[in-house]
Amino acid sequence: LKCNKLVPLFYKTCPAGKDLCYKMYMVATPKVPVKRGCIDVCPKSSLLVKYVCCNTDRCN
């Protein structure tokens, strides 16, 4: 699986066990991602922070 880094021009190949790509952003500024990368379990979103997870190459 390949996941985009914070700047989507770059990506990395995820290590074994991290089978999801994720994008995290503040609810107040949804167009500005704060973090992107590989993750094993999708975190729960909160009132301030939203997580979007997916499982295809560079989907984040």
Swiss-Prot record:
Keywords: Cardiotoxin, Cytolysis, Disulfide bond, Membrane, Secreted, Target cell membrane, Target membrane, Toxin
One Pfam match: Toxin_cobra-type
Domain of life: Eukaryota
GO cellular component terms, semicolon-separated: extracellular region; membrane; other organism cell membrane
Membrane-spanning residues: none
GO molecular function: toxin activity
GO aspect biological process, one term: killing of cells of another organism
Disulfide bonds: 3-21, 14-38, 42-53, 54-59
Purpose of the protein: Shows cytolytic activity on many different cells by forming pore in lipid membranes. In vivo, increases heart rate or kills the animal by cardiac arrest. In addition, it binds to heparin with high affinity, interacts with Kv channel-interacting protein 1 (KCNIP1) in a calcium-independent manner, and binds to integrin alpha-V/beta-3 (ITGAV/ITGB3) with moderate affinity. Has hemolytic activity towards human erythrocytes (EC(50)=0.162 uM) and cytolytic activity towards various cell lines.
Family: Belongs to the three-finger toxin family. Short-chain subfamily. Type IA cytotoxin sub-subfamily.
The protein's assembly and partners: Monomer in solution; Homodimer and oligomer in the presence of negatively charged lipids forming a pore with a size ranging between 20 and 30 Angstroms.
Protein name as it appears in the record: Cytotoxin 10
